[in-house]
């Protein structure tokens, strides 16, 4: 393909993507929210990342209409991971923010110091990124109350795509309602579109303290058992990839 035809084809693809976003907005149909979870294992320059998030990234995302939560380990001071959860209205909003942040001169100016300082020594030893969409347009992000200081980030893996589909349906049609009835304070349910481990689903319950957490999970168990054993939901989960207890940092949106 010559350059002219390539550019023409690229333009058509770009226009198609833009048009699809416009159609979504024009039709005013509810879209699934999109979530991005980054898990950073901090290096000795880790404080630079926290400063960048507080002073540059979060204000820029706020100007673009996105919400950002930043979390560290709830109790383990030796755990040097940092969790960053960004909430977008839909996939079009996600794309708008990813592109728009680089057009924000305030952000570019504010963040340049971070980019300069980490150009020869990253703030993270490793980074995992999960891109998700809500399990249903009906399930929207609910920011945990300020009193819910203990949060869990739970990642479940299914054995295959068919099992994953049934696990998502289980959450959407039955399990999420049990969480609501048990007052587990779940902020979001995310079906993973891409990430280091798939097929997976991620969700975040929240509690006032560990004692309440234990009591709520104990209450949840008997309500969950009847649906867990339904034929349509059998063998839809392989393992718990991780279950991390986290707390919000002072500059986190939630």
Outline where the language-model segments fall.
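Surface-exposed interaction/gating patches
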Residues: 134-208
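Extracellular/periplasmic catalytic domains that process cell-envelope and extracellular macromolecules
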Residues: 76-78, 121-124, 145-149, 195-197, ...
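C-terminal segment of N-terminal export signals and the immediately downstream linker at the start
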Residues: 21-39
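An amphipathic, aromatic/His-enriched active-site/gating alpha helix that lines ligand/cofactor pockets
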Residues: 7-13, 29-32, 47, 51-69, ...
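N-terminal export signals
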Residues: 5-24
């Amino acid at each position: 393909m010559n350059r002219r035809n390539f550019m023409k084809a690229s333009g058509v693809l770009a226009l198609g993507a833009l048009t699809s976003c416009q159609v979504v907005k024009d039709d005013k149909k509810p879209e699934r929210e999109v979530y991005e979870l980054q898990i950073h294992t901090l290096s000795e320059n880790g404080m630079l990342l926290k400063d960048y998030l507080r002073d540059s990234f979060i204000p820029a995302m706020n100007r673009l209409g996105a919400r950002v939560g930043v979390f560290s380990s709830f109790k383990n001071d030796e755990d040097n991971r940092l969790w960053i959860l960004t909430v977008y209205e839909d996939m079009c909003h996600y794309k708008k923010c990813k592109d728009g942040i680089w057009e924000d001169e305030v952000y570019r100016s504010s963040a340049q110091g971070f980019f300069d300082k980490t150009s020869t020594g990253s703030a993270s030893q490793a980074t995992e990124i999960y891109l998700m969409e809500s399990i249903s347009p009906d399930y929207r992000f609910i920011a945990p109350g300020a009193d819910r200081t203990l949060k869990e980030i739970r990642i479940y893996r299914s054995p295959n795509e068919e099992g994953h589909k049934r696990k998502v349906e289980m959450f959407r049609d039955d399990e999420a309602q049990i969480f609501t009835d048990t007052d587990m304070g779940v902020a979001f349910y995310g079906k993973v579109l891409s990430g280091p481990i798939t097929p997976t689903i991620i969700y975040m319950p929240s509690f006032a303290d560990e004692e309440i957490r234990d009591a709520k999970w104990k209450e949840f168990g008997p309500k969950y058992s009847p649906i867990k054993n339904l034929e349509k939901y059998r063998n839809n989960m392989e393992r718990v990839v991780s279950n991390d207890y986290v707390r919000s940092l002072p500059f986190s949106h939630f």
